[in-house]
């Protein structure tokens, strides 16, 4: 059983996803819930499916995913990154097209911290000339 299972870890913002690919019919389970049940937004569901649609393997694998931390956008990005890594473990020849689309690279952008004396990270208090 372990021979035909592929694993990938994905991260984005504060989210971490562990993705297990197994040969199957295209079922996607995230934290023991279906994809459309876990992500209400269609855009998040689309982001999760992107790497599979690119390499035309939507119906080839069942996915068991555990994801934690962050919000919906970060979790969707982390899952996409994890799926990409698992697909590369399955077949290294897929690295080229996935890299070209930008799915292999870890998006390193993080939230900028709030500074003292400012309202937010860069938003300054209103300036009064007089």
UniProtKB/Swiss-Prot annotation:
The keyword Zinc does not apply. Keywords: Ribonucleoprotein, Ribosomal protein. PROSITE patterns: RIBOSOMAL_S9 (PS00360). The keyword Ribonucleoprotein applies. GO terms for cellular component: cytosolic small ribosomal subunit. InterPro entries: Ribosomal_Su5_D2-typ_SF, Ribosomal_uS9, Ribosomal_uS9_bac/plastid, Ribosomal_uS9_CS, Ribsml_uS5_D2-typ_fold_subgr. One of its GO terms (biological process) is translation. GO terms for molecular function: RNA binding; structural constituent of ribosome. It holds the Pfam family Ribosomal_S9. It comes from the Bacteria. NCBIfam families: PRK00132.1 (NF001099). Belongs to the universal ribosomal protein uS9 family. This is Small ribosomal subunit protein uS9. It comes from Idiomarina loihiensis (strain ATCC BAA-735 / DSM 15497 / L2-TR). The lineage of its organism: Bacteria, Pseudomonadati, Pseudomonadota, Gammaproteobacteria, Alteromonadales. The gene is rpsI.
């Amino acid at each position: 059983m372990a021979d035909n299972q592929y694993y990938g870890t994905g991260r984005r913002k504060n989210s971490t996803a562990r993705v297990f690919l197994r040969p199957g019919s295209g079922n996607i389970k995230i934290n023991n819930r279906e994809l459309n049940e876990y992500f209400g937004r269609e855009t998040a569901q689309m982001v999760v499916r992107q790497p599979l649609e690119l390499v035309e393997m939507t119906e080839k694998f069942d996915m068991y995913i555990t994801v934690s931390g962050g919000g919906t956008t970060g979790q969707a990005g982390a899952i996409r990154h994890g799926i990409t890594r698992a697909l590369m473990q399955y077949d290294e020849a897929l690295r080229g097209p996935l890299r070209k689309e930008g799915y292999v690279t870890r998006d390193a952008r993080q939230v900028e911290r709030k500074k003292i004396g400012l309202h937010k990270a860069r938003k300054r208090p209103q300036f009064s000339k007089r």
